[in-house]
């Protein structure tokens, strides 16, 4: 495909394009079955009006500000969403020998996912092994999610969280996609190095 650099506001795309990142026929069948179950899901509820926002710390509050601007823009279009803000800068960091951690953020994300959220949106630094330097979302975190029937769409305005064309990698986002009846139902993510400005343009 072609690379597109977003430098100004554009209309929404006319056609949604995605892929099932299956490496085997068994994985493809598993994902198709998961999509069918999601479409026929009977667990209707308030969770389908819930949007959860996670924003990285540091960088002069850039990621927090980006999330706030996107939420403000959404509110001008509809007031039907409930916004849960899990910004790292709103929580107290714990200092360890290996650096800072945010255990309360890890816990809050876990609770938000398990109680149900339509979208889990992250803005900040990351890679295919974790989101944030403090790993508020990691493989072990995502594997522990027990959210059957309440699968979120995950959006990560971050670096290479989903390098689908690198066979040697094991992206945690794909792992969450492939989990049976838990994890996530869809993922919007980059597969290469990206920058905050373009991330925000797409996320918005």
Can you describe what each PLM-predicted range is?
Residues 1-204:
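Cysteine-dependent hydrolase recognition
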């Amino acid at each position: 495909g072609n690379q597109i650099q977003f430098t100004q506001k554009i209309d929404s795309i006319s056609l949604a394009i995605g892929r099932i990142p299956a490496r085997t026929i068994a994985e493809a069948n598993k994902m198709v079955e998961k999509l069918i179950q999601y479409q026929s899901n009977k667990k209707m509820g308030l969770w389908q009006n819930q949007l959860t926002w996670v924003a990285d710390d540091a960088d002069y509050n850039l990621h927090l500000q980006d999330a706030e601007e996107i939420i403000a823009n959404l509110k001008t279009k509809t007031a039907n969403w409930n916004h849960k803000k899990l910004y790292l800068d709103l929580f107290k960091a714990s200092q360890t020998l290996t650096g800072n951690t945010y255990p309360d953020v890890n816990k809050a994300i876990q609770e938000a996912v398990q109680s149900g959220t339509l979208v889990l949106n992250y803005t900040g630094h990351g890679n295919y092994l974790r989101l944030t330097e403090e790993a508020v979302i990691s493989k072990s975190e995502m594997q522990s999610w027990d959210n059957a029937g309440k699968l979120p769409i995950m959006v990560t305005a971050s670096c290479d969280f989903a390098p689908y064309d690198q066979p040697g990698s094991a992206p945690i986002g794909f792992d969450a996609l492939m989990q049976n009846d838990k994890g996530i139902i869809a993922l919007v993510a980059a597969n290469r190095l990206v920058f905050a400005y373009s991330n925000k343009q797409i996320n918005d």
